[in-house]
Amino acid sequence: MILVIGLGNPGTEYQYTRHNIGFIAIERIASKYHLSFSIKKKFNCEIAEAVIDRQKIIFIKPTTYMNLSGKSVILVKTYYNIKYEKVFVIHDDIDLEIGRIKFKTGGGNGGHNGLKSIDVVIGNHYNRIRIGIGRPKNNHDVADYVLNNFSESEYKIAMQSIDNIANNFGLILEHKLAEFTNKIV
């Protein structure tokens, strides 16, 4: 069983913000498998479930807002008894240039409040798919930057990266993490 979490904030006002790239990515991956999300109040998330390549996979989008994502993650992880190595979090990364993708297991949260929330409840030994959103220019406020929409050119770059992740997601299901890592760079 695999748990894939896309980080973001609920609500149409956040739908295309930089901070919601995790939601955008998980929706694209789920749509590749013809899945749709439904609200699960008991888990504080939207969820899509399927058996793909003989493996149960659960996609979630926490509805708790970014800074409380851990509340949803711990409920789903505990209910389904999912191992740490089978947890994948897709999130924005301000320290990576727009569209750059990095995969890693474990490590720090880089100041990302969604990851901090998850780390508090399950530790930091899970997998991360980091999608670069770049840094604000001219010392603009970071919170304001991540909560603003992508420019049209940034959105195109971000979507190319998301498509790259979605097109190679099957490698995760095949337990080929090294190959996935090489394909997404």
From Swiss-Prot:
GO CC terms on record? cytoplasm
The UniProt catalytic activity note for this protein reads:
an N-acyl-L-alpha-aminoacyl-tRNA + H2O = an N-acyl-L-amino acid + a tRNA + H(+)
Q: Which residues bind tRNA?
A: 14, 65, 67, 113
**Gene3D superfamilies of this UniProt entry?**
Peptidyl-tRNA hydrolase (3.40.50.1470)
- The record's EC number reads 3.1.1.29
Q: Which residues form a coiled coil?
A: none
What keywords tag this UniProt record?
A: Cytoplasm, Hydrolase, RNA-binding, tRNA-binding
For biological process, the GO terms are: protein quality control for misfolded or incompletely synthesized proteins; rescue of stalled ribosome
Primary place of residence? Answer: cytoplasm
Q: Where in the cell is it found?
A: Cytoplasm
Enzyme class, broadest EC rank: hydrolase
Q: Which residues form the active site?
A: 19 (proton acceptor)
Name the site position(s) for Discriminates between blocked and unblocked aminoacyl-tRNA.
9
> Does the UniProt entry include the keyword Ribosomal protein?
no
As one GO molecular function, the record gives: peptidyl-tRNA hydrolase activity
Q: Which CDD domains does this entry report, sorted A to Z?
A: PTH
- The protein's superkingdom reads Bacteria
Q: Where is this site: Stabilizes the basic form of H active site to accept a proton?
A: 92
In the UniProt record, does the keyword Signal occur? no
What is its quaternary makeup?
Monomer.
The record's similarity note reads: Belongs to the PTH family.
Q: Provide the function of this protein.
A: Hydrolyzes ribosome-free peptidyl-tRNAs (with 1 or more amino acids incorporated), which drop off the ribosome during protein synthesis, or as a result of ribosome stalling. Catalyzes the release of premature peptidyl moieties from peptidyl-tRNA molecules trapped in stalled 50S ribosomal subunits, and thus maintains levels of free tRNAs and 50S ribosomes.
Name of the protein in its database record: Peptidyl-tRNA hydrolase
**Species whose genome carries this gene:** Rickettsia prowazekii (strain Madrid E)
Instruction: Give the gene that encodes this protein.
Output: pth
